[in-house]
Amino acid sequence: MRRLILAEKFSAARRLAQILSEGTAEKVRADGSSHFTFSIHGDDVIVFPLRGHVVELDYPEAARDWALMDLDDLIDLEPVREETPVTLHDALRGFADTIDEVVLATDYDREGELIAVEALETLRGRKPHLTARRARFSAMTPGEVRRAFETPVEPDWALAEAAAARQRIDLAWGAVLTRFLTLECGSGRQLLSAGRVQTPTLRLAADRERDREDFMARPFWNVTLLAGDPPIEATAVGGPFWDEGGAQALVALAGLGDTAVVERVEHRERRDPPPAPFNTTSFLAQASRQGTSPSRAMLAAQSLYVSGEISYPRTDNTVYPPSTAFHEILGRLAESPYAAYAERLLARSELTVSRGPIQTTDHPPLHPTAAPAKRRAGLRSWVYDLIARRFLATLSPASVAAVTEAHLRVGDTEFLAVGETTVDPGWREILPDENPVSVLPDLKEGDALPLREIRIVEERTKPPPLHTAGTLLLTMQRLGLGTKSTRHEIVDLLFRRQYVSGRSIRTTAAGRALVDALAIYGPDVTTPDMTRHLEDRMSDIAEGRATLGEVVAESRHALHGVLAELRAHRESLGRWVRDATFFEKDYGACDACADGRLVRRKARNGWAFLGCSRFPECRQRYRLGALGQRLPWSESAATADAAEVPSTAA
């Protein structure tokens, strides 16, 4: 028998060939592409790497003229399929003539299933009755890969249909909204993109920023004391006070005493359960919290998955399935920096396993599948460490702390001091708490502590924090915006479009103007409701409760309604956005010619700089600093050639 195995990428094909051939596979290069061949049990096997999606959807050539194509017609227009690259499809057709069966071994999720089905359609175009089977695995470890190929299943056609529906729906929403906004609001020069997930996500960032701007800080007061040697700090019971007079009255009740008397000491135990297992969104949020962008963290995780070091990194699941081989995984960590901790877990009579709120059956939560490869310290090592420590924490006992509350009295005023000590670090040994804890000295009822100070401390209520990429991902998950695989890409897109900026995310003038205008003149585009409904309907396709045609028709109907609403307010919408984006791009009069304006532009190499609007008559230019400030031009920072001919405004 001659068998073709389809992998999603070259690195995955190499790993599968290495495992299945036990290291005997040979790399073959032909007709501009590479694949792997080997023989096993009398069968000839070819492992062929795809390149992600091998079919692109786009509108016909006649629909690509933005000015001539009516947008209502565009909504109902069927996109055309284009094979890409052509050489890859030619290679597949060549294989079809000689193979007996094909095994789909792309990532097991919606996109992976669709990628495999795209290639399968090319093969069956040549050999209509070609047998196709599916190998499902959640880790590229030798054991799991071999089990998947020993027990293949039928391809999941419904899963692929759900992904195909998403392609059609996202293409239509993105094309129609982007064309409308660019033509009506972009002055013909600036691309203004919008989408059914992108725009509600932008609004989340804008609303949080607006909440912060509108926040009115209120002052409040606490009364604190320092007493004893070494000194302990205690806070007056009854606070905080919303008027300073209340705090002053309480200080007066304390009188002129010179000691704080311990009235009673209470002890209790606090148990903090271990954290839930990582799914994709919580993993990326934690990476963001610790300073790594979600997109970079996902690239590193994908690389670790392909090398067999972690499980599949795209999952909603926060509950380990019963089949998870915890002891086997812990055993693999015996030759790693986590060996001592893993061995202590193995020595326990019973492992306690935490669980999160989301349970699915596609893939398990993220976890290590092998000891880390020996490599230089870098992003992949950091991401592996993040995932491994979280996994070990989820198998660990609760953290136990002894909490002490000491009630002190000065005059007629009661104060409370709280301290804690660690009884059993539990999971915090592998995931230490970064917050410092206070420890109280040994206090007994009746102790008189020398009073050092009583003071009134004024504070102010704090506004809600700006979103970070991590908190935005978690909010998107909670509201049903996007999927585990696309959320970080949407956030990344907002940065690339220059709608948002900064680690603490702020909207740019263009981003704020766009989302504010749409919130008034096309609110359905900016709220999660419509997007969440379409996400639910695509899940219905995956589970066999709806068809691609039904859901695409629903989407088209909704998009017609949104477009009609936007058209009804096209003048107001366009004026709003144009006014705001002009002032964002304009940096004042040119100080060289006085007739032009300094505007932000982008050079051929992608550098942003300030140049005169009268270019090429006036060639005045400045560098832009990280915070947008004007800096003297420097040839060492950007070449004159790259900046010589500016492109459209950034």
Map each language-model feature to its residues.
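Intrinsically disordered, low-complexity regulatory segments
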Residues: 1-173
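Basic, low-complexity terminal or inter-domain segments flanking catalytic cores
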Residues: 2-4, 122, 178, 214, ...
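Amphipathic alpha-helical transducer elements in NTP-driven molecular machines
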Residues: 10-13, 17, 44-47, 82-89, ...
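Structured, non-catalytic alpha/beta "coupling" segments that mediate domain-domain communication
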Residues: 31-60, 199-244, 393-439
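Phosphate-interacting basic helix/loop segments used at nucleotide- and nucleic-acid interfaces
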Residues: 78-96, 102, 204-205, 286, ...
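C-terminal or mid-to-C-terminal helical accessory/interaction module adjacent to the motor/catalytic core
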Residues: 97-98, 140-227, 267-271
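Metal- or metallocofactor-binding catalytic centers and their adjacent structured scaffolds
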Residues: 244-277, 284, 447
